[in-house]
Amino acid sequence: MRTIRRVVLLLWVMEEGKFRELLEQNYTWPALYMFKFICPANNEAVAKLEQLFDPEVAELSLRPSSKGNYVSFTAKELMISVDAVIERYRLATDIPGLISL
């Protein structure tokens, strides 16, 4: 499992430059940013994902998949910078089974 996480982190670092460039080109900061994730439908994964966002600041939406195995998670939040968005995605990489969209 640790090897998989290292590979994912390595890919993340390689792609971060492209992602940063797209964010800088398409947003004027601060900006309302929409995060989208799919995670396993277990309480631990959902709770960890929810902890990344303050419900008083972010608009959160959860929707279970048709078979109930996964949860679609959307969060809209006013983000101050590109770095803040990237840091939030970095924190999310610690959640097992999480897919960032």
Where are the predicted features?
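Long, contiguous binding/interaction regions
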Residues: 2-72, 78-101
